[in-house]
Amino acid sequence: MSDKTYLTKGGYNKLKDELDDLKTNVRQQVLEKITEAKSHGDLSENAEYEAAKEEQAQVESRISTLERVLSTATILDEKDIKTDKVYILTTVLLKDLDRDEEVEYTLVSSEEADSENGKISVKSPIGKNLLGKSVGEIVEIKVPKGIMRYEVLNIKVK
């Protein structure tokens, strides 16, 4: 079950840098913590050892995830993205019809999502409902707080 991941060149490089750091620095630091904890004797009641082993499991899991994502990634070039409809890597200007406010989102992969900077995942409720929409269309999105209604005002590539 390998889902294809679409990334910008910058997003790919960021994940690759994280992977390299985990493999070359973080992994070694965790091994040093394990070695240090082992030197304290009895492992059956060694909280420091257990914490280091848990950290090691988390690091190895993240390494595995990043390797999978990067191996299935397709790097998208923004100049090839169309703006006739909402696609991944398009920036969408929306009018919130309930609050009469405008909001702008850029649709990205889950790995590049950053809601504080207006980057939302295409797998999020908003992202899923925006995909394929055109300027002028009304989008109704079910969210935990109810239904949000937006009008698509503009689609562009930043």
UniProtKB/Swiss-Prot annotation:
GO biological process per UniProt: DNA-templated transcription elongation; regulation of DNA-templated transcription elongation
PROSITE patterns: GREAB_1, GREAB_2
Coiled-coil residues: 8-74
Any one GO molecular function term: DNA binding
Keywords: Coiled coil, DNA-binding, Transcription, Transcription regulation
Residue stretches spanning the membrane: none
Assigned protein family: Belongs to the GreA/GreB family.
PANTHER family xref list: TRANSCRIPTION ELONGATION FACTOR GREA
Chain's role: Necessary for efficient RNA polymerase transcription elongation past template-encoded arresting sites. The arresting sites in DNA have the property of trapping a certain fraction of elongating RNA polymerases that pass through, resulting in locked ternary complexes. Cleavage of the nascent transcript by cleavage factors such as GreA or GreB allows the resumption of elongation from the new 3'terminus. GreA releases sequences of 2 to 3 nucleotides.
NCBIfam families linked: greA, PRK00226.1-2, PRK00226.1-4
Protein name (database record): Transcription elongation factor GreA
Organism, scientific name: Chloroherpeton thalassium (strain ATCC 35110 / GB-78)
Gene designation per UniProt: greA
